[in-house]
Every structure is written in structure tokens, then in C-alpha cells.
Swiss-Prot record:
It comes from Pisum sativum (Garden pea). It is an enzyme of class 2 (transferase). One of its GO terms (molecular function) is ATP binding. This is Cell division control protein 2 homolog 2. The active site is at D113 (proton acceptor).
Length: 151
């Protein structure tokens, strides 16, 4: 599966949100977290003799994040006419979701965008957290501060 990193309105280079997402995904290795396989680029604008973009030969620079393939997202499955999850399926998906979230939290990552379209499921019933575009890393100091403030 591919996720295109939009470069249309980027005056300052590679988007910081994409850098953050890539850094987070590169440190997470768990069966319930989507695997980032590689990053691929396509050519940008061709250059003229002086190294300037040639307006006649413009090709938009495209950068893609390549992920392992998953067959469905939870929202797509749930929206199918007549689709009803069984109690064992719900328990299985919840266990996988919570296991993946626990792994992220132990590794100091907050996903911050849990929703059905970001929960990917393959045909064998394996669930993976996806789309870490809003995710943030945190430190132990922040967690200790939050715990003290909540007392």
C-alpha cells in the first residue's frame, strides 16, 4: 500500500509531519502496528542547462511511503450491508488494538487518531494500527508531570 507525501505547497522542503511520522514508524516493530517497508521518490522537475527547473518538462516530485498490504479497514468492513461482527471477532480485534496501543505507549508514542479507517485488517483477521500522521513521541518526564498534575 502507498501513502503519497504531498509536496505541492511545501516551500521549506520535506513536510515536518511526514518526517515525524517516518521517525515514529521506523522505531515501532510490532505485529499490531503497520510496517513501513520503504520510501520511494519519483523524479521532480527536469532542469535546463543552468540547473533551473525547465517549465516545458515539468514532472511533479512525488514521495511515497510504502507499507505492507492489508485487505480492509475496519470502517469499510463495518459499512458493508448486512455485516455483523461476532462477539469473538470483536474480542479478537479489541485485544489486537489494545496490544498495539500498549506497545506504542511503552515505546513513548501517542497515536492521537484512533478511528475505524486507521485500523487495518487482513483476510486472516489480523489488525494493525495505521496512519501515524498525527502521532507524537513523548518523554518519561512528560508522563511524570501529567501523573503529578492529575493527583
Amino acid at each position: 500500500a502507498l501513502k503519497e507525501i504531498r509536496m505541492d505547497n511545501e516551500r521549506e522542503g520535506f513536510p515536518i509531519t511526514a518526517i515525524r511520522e517516518i521517525k515514529i514508524l521506523k522505531k515501532l516493530h510490532h505485529e499490531n502496528v503497520i510496517k513501513l517497508k520503504e520510501i520511494v521518490t519519483s523524479p521532480g522537475p527536469e532542469k535546463d542547462d543552468q540547473g533551473r527547473p525547465d517549465g516545458n518538462k515539468y514532472k511533479r516530485l512525488a514521495i511515497y511511503m510504502v507499507f505492507e498490504y492489508m485487505d480492509h479497514d475496519l470502517t469499510g468492513l463495518a459499512d458493508r450491508p448486512g455485516m455483523r461482527f461476532t462477539v469473538p471477532q470483536i474480542k479478537c480485534y479489541m485485544r489486537q488494538l489494545l496490544t498495539g496501543l500498549h506497545y506504542c505507549h511503552v515505546n513513548q508514542v501517542l497515536h492521537r487518531d484512533i478511528k475505524g479507517s486507521n485500523l487495518l485488517i487482513d483476510n486472516e483477521g489480523n489488525l494493525k494500527l495505521a496512519d501515524f500522521g498525527l502521532a507524537r513521541s513523548f518523554s518519561n518526564e512528560i508522563m511524570q508531570t501529567l501523573q503529578i498534575e492529575s493527583l
